[in-house]
Curated annotation (Swiss-Prot):
This is GTPase Der. It comes from Francisella philomiragia subsp. philomiragia (strain ATCC 25017 / CCUG 19701 / FSC 153 / O#319-036). Transmembrane segments: none annotated. NCBIfam families: GTPase_EngA, small_GTP. GO terms for molecular function: GTP binding; ribosome binding. Associates with the 50S ribosomal subunit. GTP 1 binds at residues 9-16, 56-60, 118-121.
Amino acid sequence: MSFLVAIVGRANVGKSTLFNVLTNSRDALVFDFEGVTRDRQYGQAKYDDLGYLVVDTGGISDQDAGFDEFMAKQSQMAIDEANLVFFVVDGRSGLTSGDEYVANLLRQKDKRVVVVVNKVDGVEEESAMAEFYELGFDKVFAVSAAHRRNTQKLLDKFLKKPLNEFYRDYTQTQEHKEQQRHGIHFSLIGRPNVGKSTLTNRMLGEDRVVVFDMPGTTIDSVSIPFERHGHKYTIVDTAGVRRRGKVKQTLEKFSVIKTLQAIQDSNVVVAVVDAREGISDQDLSLIHFAIKNGRALVLAINKWDGMTEEDRNLVKQDLKRKLFFLEDYVDVHFISALHGTNVGHVFESIDTAYACANKKITTADATRLMQLAVEAHSPPMVGKFRIKLKYAHVGGHNPPVIVIHGNQVNRLPNSYKRYLENFFREALDFRGTPIVFEFKQSENPFADRKNKRIKDEGSKSKKTK
């Protein structure tokens, strides 16, 4: 599981601006599933190297019907899921009935809430904050998200402690220990109704997950340990148990949060795609999130049975066009979860991807491969600078991290970095896992001696004078 920060508040108070500050990016994950609130944003953030998820829940209003009511339900689910809630208000506009409506929702939850008084640039902070204490929360803090004023202080004061406590407690939980014991931990991700639960049942060989043919009815994710051919696994079906009723009110959006958390907790991610619908932007968002988190990856193109040869060729062309960045290393399987076709091959790829992600490489081997790559294709000259790669070593596993030391490595072009990745991948036969390269500038061992000599010469010249 991941620590979750929910940003809530009425419309136009600066929630998205605060979201961008926390995630340090405008590349939010935006999902548009059927039955899902539009333009919801999910992002990753870090504080002192501790990762957490951020969700911008959209504006809550006190309207009783229609889209606003649905938005309010979405935001209430965000509150339920969150470890910390940033309740954003507008310091210029002052306290409104909309703020009071949101505060009333929050008071019904036993959550850690910080009232973030935004847009205080040009306004005296204490006076801007004063009236918001009327909302009944003891933690009130003023920021200007647009100018990043006090935003770091906000995190230092209110995020640091609960985030550190979360990570400390999580590593001690039984859930974490069970996850470590049950072999390869993999998750099935994908849009609603692509067949994740059917594939779960096929993999387990029994109907452990109740499935109805209704998109948008996700309630929770299900984690199940099992064994197959003597190998231990834990499977997470992010679709989980489905129910018939309340399709419009069911908050499928928050299966997205569970999906993102499942990706982060997994050793291997199986992305399930409906062959008849093809690859969507949502599929690409989930796949990119998995790669960004360094997860090993397998693709399962489901509902392949019953398609004409012409349609199959069109699907393959579409996959090649949209997933060109994966074709060198990710296994793609065309399956029928319902009939079991090729599901066994998915297991083979899961095993291979996991083994590659955790492959042991010595410093000698890493350096030797780097030298072979340089001999075959030297780093380019960058202006008057000659880039020299000296040695390499492994910096981590799952994903594999290769650390390369050298001179002028900060000038190494991306094209050469891609060349190194492809060279290492082919030489080590890495399938299914991304490889992370880190480049570190080698320190000049004579720099201190040179600086000392210059300092000494300076001292002598002063004495001479």
